[in-house]
């Protein structure tokens, strides 16, 4: 077991052991590190979002198996077993973007277990899990170590939970191993709970009446609930992963709008507060603390006049001049807690505040929250940490589990059965044909043929009219531009300066508009149902595109989902830190720049997670999903070719063919 204070180098050593820090850009390496054995190594990182590679649950677990050349016939049993071992009972095609942080962490652990590693490296693997999840993972890891004889290296600040499993404890400090006993005190006994109760006051600070919460503003999460928090009271939101603790916490903080019911903070709706007014009464720490920072140094974040004093109380003195995003996870959380628990707040809302904290940071957290309660602040924290709840004497509000359900069912369409490459050909062939000429006949025939096929193509495509809007707008604007400024011929209808509307310009405008519709409509409708994963499978298996290039691109697309989530949380914190009243341009620029920086960090972590699951180890891969190109798919290509041939043929037969080139 690796332990030590935040920033001591535990995660770096874990990555080195996993063999994923080889590039010169990763840092300077001195000495030698030898890992015996050629079997796969499993690595689970701290942040769940940084290691979800694929868009669907089973595909994500299969990722490492494909890279390791595991036969497809063996994958299903491995995937099912690994997911069962971590208690993640979801549909095979359940979108990974809809998982909570704890569910993502279970998925990452399942991905590592499925590879049957000889060396399993876990970097704070259970910090985001609910108690049932922690117990299930601990039992699974214990069984694997016992039955399979794998070597386990675990990084955790809570050594007690691993006391029955680890044989040796290594303590790091400032990147060096320091002498420590084989069984330090924290392995044998947890800090005694003090059950300290706070002198609550009568006044109600926060209340929720018939509150219905929603993350996306459209789908209700759980049942309506009622809640009241008084001054000086600490309330812990509990419940399993995915129960809605984060959503409820951010709704209570005035950062998310309720779907129903009402939230009242000091007699007012917190959602109606200005950003500055809200920041003066509410302090917020998100689950990922990096979203809390807006300045280039810890000193500037804390305020230069009070930085030394606050940094000393939170153990941040040695890093005052460091950039907040360069800190370790535990250091970032301590800084975020320091920022949220300043003077003036009446309510603190904390999402997993003890996650990634070392023993010193945890002790400071407990002291600070107790002091805040004694001063009359209301404290709401979403947490899985039983010991923290016990030490704080918090009142628990337990959210029931929310049924995961099945993956969203959408109406079936003929497009769902088509190979993506066939659909690509069906859209590309008529487009190439129409690009060879610009005339009214070919464009008109093509639009008529496409229109006749819309009932077949658009069946099962939701909101296809909305999807077509960009094409229609492009068509309309192009037609107007050419009608006013195109080459004039024939009868002149209107002339004013550079504007000339003639018979020829109107004919050309109509032909251009119809051609844009004829080219754009099939592409939009055909690709509206193409799944990115199926398209990647078709490219690698049917088109023989480079495997690693295709999969890397697919992982990059999934990163957009993570970045979209980052943008949402960042916007919460812009409001929570009192910066949401600025002009739209300044807010957008601020959020965009930070998201860009976070995206770079995310991509680095994602690349590390992919490498840990054998990505790039072999030139070829096996495939969990088989991409087929049955005979019926040639009908799509034939249909596209027919549209192109009939359109151009009609123009030639009528003498209207107007070659674009030559």
Each PLM stretch: what is its role?
Residues 18, 253:
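Helix-to-loop junction immediately C-terminal to a conserved catalytic motif
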Residues 26-39, 261-269, 278:
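Conserved ABC transporter NBD signature motif
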């Amino acid at each position: 077991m690796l332990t030590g204070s935040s920033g001591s180098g535990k995660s770096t050593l874990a990555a080195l052991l996993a063999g994923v820090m080889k590039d010169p850009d990763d840092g300077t390496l001195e000495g030698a590190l030898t890992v015996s054995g050629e079997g796969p190594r499993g690595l689970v990182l701290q942040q769940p979002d940084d290691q979800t590679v694929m868009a669907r649950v089973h595909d994500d677990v299969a990722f490492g198996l494909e890279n390791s050349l595991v036969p497809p016939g063996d994958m299903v049993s491995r995937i099912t077993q690994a997911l069962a071992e971590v208690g993640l009972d979801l549909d095979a095609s359940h979108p990974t973007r809809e998982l909570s942080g704890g569910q993502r962490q279970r998925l990452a652990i399942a991905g590592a277990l499925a590879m049957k590693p000889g060396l399993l490296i876990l970097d704070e693997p259970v910090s985001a899990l609910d108690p049932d999840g922690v117990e299930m993972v601990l039992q699974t890891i214990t069984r694997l170590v016992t039955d399979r004889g794998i070597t386990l290296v675990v990084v955790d600040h809570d050594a007690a939970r691993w006391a029955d499993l680890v044989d040796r404890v290594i303590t790091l400090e400032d990147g060096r191993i320091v002498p420590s006993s084989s069984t330090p005190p924290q392995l044998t006994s947890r800090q005694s709970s003090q059950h300290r109760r706070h002198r609550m006051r009568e006044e109600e600070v926060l209340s929720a009446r018939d509150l219905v919460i929603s993350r996306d503003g459209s789908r209700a999460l759980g049942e309506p609930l009622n809640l009241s928090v008084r001054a000086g009271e600490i309330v812990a939101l509990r419940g399993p992963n995915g129960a809605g603790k984060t959503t409820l916490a951010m709704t209570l903080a005035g950062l998310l709008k309720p779907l129903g019911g009402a939230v009242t903070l000091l007699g007012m709706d917190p959602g109606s507060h200005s950003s500055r007014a809200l920041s003066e009464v509410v302090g917020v720490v998100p689950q990922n603390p990096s979203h809390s920072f807006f300045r280039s140094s810890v000193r500037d974040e804390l305020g230069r006049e009070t930085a030394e004093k606050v940094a000393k109380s939170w153990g941040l003195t040695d890093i005052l001049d460091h950039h907040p995003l360069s800190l370790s996870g535990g250091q970032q959380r301590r800084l975020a807690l320091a920022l949220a628990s300043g003077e003036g707040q009446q309510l603190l809302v904390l999402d997993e505040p003890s996650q990634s904290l070392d023993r010193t940071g945890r002790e400071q957290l407990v002291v600070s929250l107790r002091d805040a309660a004694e001063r009359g602040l209301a404290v709401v924290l979403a947490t899985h940490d039983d010991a923290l709840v016990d030490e704080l004497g918090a009142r628990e509000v337990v959210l029931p589990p929310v049924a995961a359900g099945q993956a969203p069912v959408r109406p079936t369409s003929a497009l769902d059965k088509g190979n993506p490459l066939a659909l690509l050909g069906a859209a590309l062939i008529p487009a190439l044909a129409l690009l060879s000429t610009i005339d009214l006949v070919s464009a008109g025939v093509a639009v008529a043929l496409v229109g006749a096929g819309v009932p077949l193509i658009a069946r099962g495509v939701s909101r296809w009219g909305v999807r077509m809007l960009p094409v229609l707008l492009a068509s309309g604007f192009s037609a107007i531009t050419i009608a006013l400024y195109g080459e004039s011929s024939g009868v002149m209808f209107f002339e004013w300066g550079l504007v000339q509307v003639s018979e020829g310009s109107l004919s050309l405008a109509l032909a251009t508009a119809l051609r844009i519709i004829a080219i754009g409509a099939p592409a939009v409708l055909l690709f509206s149902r193409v799944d990115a994963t199926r398209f990647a499978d078709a490219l690698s298996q049917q088109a023989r595109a480079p495997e690693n290039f295709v999969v890397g691109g697919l992982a990059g697309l999934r990163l957009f989902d993570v970045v979209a989530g980052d943008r949402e949380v960042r916007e919460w914190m812009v409001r929570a830190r009192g910066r949401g009243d600025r002009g739209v341009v300044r807010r957008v620029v601020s959020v965009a720049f930070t998201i860009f920086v976070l995206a770079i960090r995310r991509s680095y972590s994602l690349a590390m997670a992919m490498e840990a699951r054998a990505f790039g180890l072999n030139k070829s891969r096996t495939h969990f999903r088989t991409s087929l190109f049955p005979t019926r798919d040639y009908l799509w290509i034939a249909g596209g070719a027919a549209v192109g041939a009939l359109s151009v043929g009609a123009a030639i037969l009528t003498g209207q063919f107007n070659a674009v080139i030559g």
